[in-house]
Amino acid sequence: MIRVAMTKGRIQKQVTILLEQAGFDMTAVREMGRELVVTIPDDLEIIFGKANDVITFLEHGIVDIGFVGKDTLDENDFDDYYELLDLKVGQCIFALASYPDFLNKKFHRRKRIASKYPRITKNYFAQKQEDIEIIKLEGSVELGPVVGLADAIVDIVETGNTLSANGLVVIEKISQISTRMIVNKVSFKFKKDKIIEIVERLENAQTN
């Protein structure tokens, strides 16, 4: 039995399609109601949870494989896993965004940056050797500059529609985001053949 944790929502839908294309019977997933754990043929048990919980399950050896966004991996300080595959779904970017005049403004204090991702934000500005104030927001991060709480934001940008609707633009692209397949290192040691088989089937589905 291989236990898999998958992020609920958009990633769940996109990975389900990819697994079907790889030849896995995902009927139980498509027909499930409020179940949080389902078993499918090929001896796979799939657990559905929030993105951070997927990493927690993997960290504690509850699951062998996790499907989770690169944004969650970069924000989390747990790194004792193997990243075996970029699924190339859920693609978007991390970006610094603000009003168009951001780069021309003179700041006589630390810049205030709003984000749901303080670790990524801190690392990004540390590479630029900039000391900033990070303001953590959980909701619509775009509100930071709009209400005057922050000078700019670091957030995921998919279409850019929300930014433009609020007068904001991408100042700089930080990194590319997509869904990744990660594996518990102990699981990989003892279940390597089965895990590699899953990777190869997914890779074949991506190229066909």
Swiss-Prot record:
Gene3D superfamilies in the cross-refs: Periplasmic binding protein-like II (3.40.190.10)
InterPro entries the record matches: ATP_PRibTrfase_cat, ATP_PRibTrfase_CS, ATP_PRibTrfase_HisG, ATP_PRibTrfase_HisG_short
Subcellular localization(s) per the UniProt record: Cytoplasm
UniProt-recorded name of the protein: ATP phosphoribosyltransferase
Functional note: Catalyzes the condensation of ATP and 5-phosphoribose 1-diphosphate to form N'-(5'-phosphoribosyl)-ATP (PR-ATP). Has a crucial role in the pathway because the rate of histidine biosynthesis seems to be controlled primarily by regulation of HisG enzymatic activity.
Alphabetical GO biological process terms: L-histidine biosynthetic process
Domain notes: Lacks the C-terminal regulatory region which is replaced by HisZ.
Any single GO CC term annotated in Swiss-Prot or TrEMBL for this entry: cytoplasm
Pfam family, one: HisG
Keyword entries, A-Z: Amino-acid biosynthesis, ATP-binding, Cytoplasm, Glycosyltransferase, Histidine biosynthesis, Nucleotide-binding, Transferase
Chain coiled-coil ranges: none
SUPFAM superfamilies on file: Periplasmic binding protein-like II
Keyword Nucleus: no
Chief site of localization: cytoplasm
Pathway(s) annotated for this protein in UniProt: Amino-acid biosynthesis; L-histidine biosynthesis; L-histidine from 5-phospho-alpha-D-ribose 1-diphosphate: step 1/9
